[in-house]
């Protein structure tokens, strides 16, 4: 099968030809990237570039074809509406002229699938790090589920906003990478909430640091060390939550050597496999559109021209995945004497649990020391405070702050992830409402951080928690728990409803669930889509 792919979601006009029947992967890519005269991407100028460049790159690729085209695939979204409309129109016209099926591809799923295709991985977690996006995906029940994502700006856009502030031309990522090699680490805000992250505060702090006279190279080093450590930590949390041992990287920011090195080091430390496609498949390109288009066409996932409207807000979890096998069971570490979590090694001894936050080789030493120390102290305090509020938690038996080690009572028989029930989920709703009324959050209440026994449901691992009276923070706690249900449970909708019912009954304020709706709408591409 030969598939012609067309890509043009934002700034890169690209066409590609993929021959699925070739002895070795054969992908011919022709791209023409838009380069603004100054500042960032202007939607109107980008669309004008697409209008001129798309016909040219398609013509070049068609000239390289040595046989008939069997299908046309195009990036249906997400992206800039004016650019997507040009790409969609070109793809429809081409499919009709060639009298072949049309395939509408989700741009972000294509970033994931090109890594899965090239690596041969079966059940990977995917970290997508691109201009407008940053999210972690895993396959579950016929869809790629969003386990975590940016709650404001994309990682690449945050970098570009910083570089525009210092007067550098788009794209900013390569310039930050170059300057960071000569810089010293500068501390910047580190914001991870469960498996979600925020980059707007880091970007603002980086601008302020430059304005205050900190050398630009030092700020660039701080940006890389902070932002990429956040991405790597969340990817590791996703591996731990799902029990998977394969990670693929997608998106243009993935071309950064430091980010790839961090992810590779993290995976090596936990015995997981890692794959990053070659750079031409990481940045926006039609090759990944053609490869996924071939898989979708072979599975019959084509669309009539009349139903092929673009969707500028096309989320990856909206795509029905029909082209791959069902998921295989994840490895169950429950019986292991030593368990490797996302940020700590847990050793079981009699009725005790010894939790050690060992140094993370992928993080800068100063950042790593700060996170390990602060999280150890907070976990001990908040675990005890929650217990005083009446929430079942382990007894804290010993804390060694310099060694970042806590000894706790061993509680429960299983993680909630492996023993889900409406009653236990309702208990989590009551527990979170109680600690929120007490003035603090858990910070990472996933189904791996809840232990269950015959009669009680325990909250554990408060290392990302903190004291706060902000309704927004309480809503984020609820959001993190619900995301973990969606990523691991077959009947997630019913369990989410049970959780929210119990939370609403127990909480002193009714504002948290209202704010939760606002938080859910803040993820990438949640607004009404632009279609045409």
Curated annotation (Swiss-Prot):
Binding of ATP, residues: 338-346, 355
GO biological processes: tRNA threonylcarbamoyladenosine modification
Molecular function terms, GO-annotated: ATP binding; iron ion binding; metalloendopeptidase activity; N(6)-L-threonylcarbamoyladenine synthase activity; protein serine kinase activity; protein serine/threonine kinase activity; protein serine/threonine/tyrosine kinase activity; zinc ion binding
GO cellular component, one term: cytoplasm
Xref: InterPro entries: Aminoglycoside_PTrfase (IPR002575), ATPase_NBD (IPR043129), Bud32 (IPR022495), Gcp-like_dom (IPR000905), KAE1/TsaD (IPR017861), Kae1_archaea_euk (IPR034680), Kinase-like_dom_sf (IPR011009), Peptidase_M22_CS (IPR017860)
The keyword RNA-binding is annotated on this UniProt entry: no
Coiled-coil annotated spans: none
Reaction(s) the record says it catalyses: L-seryl-[protein] + ATP = O-phospho-L-seryl-[protein] + ADP + H(+); L-threonyl-[protein] + ATP = O-phospho-L-threonyl-[protein] + ADP + H(+); L-threonylcarbamoyladenylate + adenosine(37) in tRNA = N(6)-L-threonylcarbamoyladenosine(37) in tRNA + AMP + H(+)
Major localization class: cytoplasm
Positions with a binding annotation for Fe cation: 107, 111, 284
Pfam families the record matches: APH (PF01636), TsaD (PF00814)
Cofactor(s) this protein requires: Fe(2+)
Region (Kae1) location: 1-323
Keywords, sorted A to Z: Acyltransferase, ATP-binding, Cytoplasm, Iron, Kinase, Metal-binding, Multifunctional enzyme, Nucleotide-binding, Serine/threonine-protein kinase, Transferase, tRNA processing
Subunit description: Component of the KEOPS complex that consists of Kae1, Bud32, Cgi121 and Pcc1; the whole complex dimerizes.
Family of the protein in this entry: In the N-terminal section; belongs to the KAE1 / TsaD family.
Role this protein plays: Required for the formation of a threonylcarbamoyl group on adenosine at position 37 (t(6)A37) in tRNAs that read codons beginning with adenine. Is a component of the KEOPS complex that is probably involved in the transfer of the threonylcarbamoyl moiety of threonylcarbamoyl-AMP (TC-AMP) to the N6 group of A37. The Kae1 domain likely plays a direct catalytic role in this reaction. The Bud32 domain probably displays kinase activity that regulates Kae1 function.
Record's protein name: Probable bifunctional tRNA threonylcarbamoyladenosine biosynthesis protein
Phylogenetic classification of the source organism: Archaea, Methanobacteriati, Methanobacteriota, Stenosarchaea group, Halobacteria
């Amino acid at each position: 099968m030969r598939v012609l792919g067309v890509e043009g979601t934002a700034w890169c006009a690209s066409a590609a030809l993929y021959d699925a029947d070739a002895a070795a992967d054969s992908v011919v890519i022709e791209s023409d990237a838009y380069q603004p005269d100054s500042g960032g991407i202007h939607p109107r100028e980008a669309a004008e570039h697409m209008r001129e460049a798309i016909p040219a790159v398609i013509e070049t690729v068609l000239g390289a074809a040595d046989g008939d085209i069997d299908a046309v695939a195009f990036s249906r979204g997400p992206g800039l509406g004016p650019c997507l409309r040009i790409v969609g129109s070109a793809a429809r016209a081409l499919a009709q002229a060639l009298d072949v099926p049309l395939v509408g591809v989700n741009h972000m799923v294509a970033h994931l699938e090109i890594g899965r295709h090239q690596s041969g991985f079966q059940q990977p977690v995917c970290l997508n790090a691109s201009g407008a996006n940053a999210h972690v995906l895993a396959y579950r029940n016929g869809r790629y589920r969003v386990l975590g994502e940016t709650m404001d700006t994309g990682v690449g856009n945050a970098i570009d906003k910083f570089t525009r502030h210092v007067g550098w031309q788009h794209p900013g990522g390569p310039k930050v990478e170059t300057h960071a090699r000569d810089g010293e680490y500068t501390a910047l805000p580190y914001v991870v909430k469960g498996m979600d992250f925020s980059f707007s505060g880091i970007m603002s702090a980086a601008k302020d640091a430059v304005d205050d006279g900190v050398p630009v190279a030092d700020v660039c080093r701080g940006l890389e060390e902070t932002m990429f450590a956040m991405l790597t930590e969340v990817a590791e949390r996703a591996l731990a939550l799902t029990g998977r041992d394969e990670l693929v990287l997608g998106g243009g920011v993935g071309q950064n050597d430091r980010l790839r090195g961090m992810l590779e080091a993290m995976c090596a430390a936990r015995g997981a496999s890692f794959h990053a496609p070659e750079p031409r498949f990481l940045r926006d390109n039609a090759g990944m559109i053609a490869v996924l288009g071939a898989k979708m066409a072979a599975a019959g996932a084509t669309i009539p021209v009349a139903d092929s409207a673009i969707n500028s807000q096309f989320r990856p979890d909206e795509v029905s995945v029909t082209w791959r096998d069902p998921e295989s069971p994840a490895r169950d570490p429950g019986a292991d004497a030593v368990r490797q979590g996302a940020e700590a090694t847990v050793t079981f001894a009699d009725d005790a649990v010894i939790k050690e936050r060992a140094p993370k080789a992928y993080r800068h030493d100063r950042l790593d020391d700060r996170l390990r120390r602060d999280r150890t102290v907070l976990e001990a305090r908040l675990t005890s405070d929650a217990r005083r509020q009446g929430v079942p938690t382990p007894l804290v038996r010993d804390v060694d702050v310099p060694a970042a080690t806590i000894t706790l009572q061993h509680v429960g028989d299983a993680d909630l992830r492996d023993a889900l029930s409406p009653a236990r989920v309702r208990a989590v709703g009551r527990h979170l409402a109680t600690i929120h009324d007490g003035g603090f959050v858990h910070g990472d209440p996933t189904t791996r951080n809840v232990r269950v026994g015959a009669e009680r449901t325990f909250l554990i691992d408060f290392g990302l928690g903190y004291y706060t009276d902000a309704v927004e923070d309480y809503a984020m706690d609820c959001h993190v728990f619900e995301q973990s249900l969606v990523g691991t449970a077959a009947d997630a909708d019913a369990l989410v409803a049970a959780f929210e019912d119990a939370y609403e009954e127990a909480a002193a304020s009714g504002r948290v669930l209202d704010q939760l709706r606002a938080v859910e709408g803040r993820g990438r591409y949640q607004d009404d889509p632009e279609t045409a």
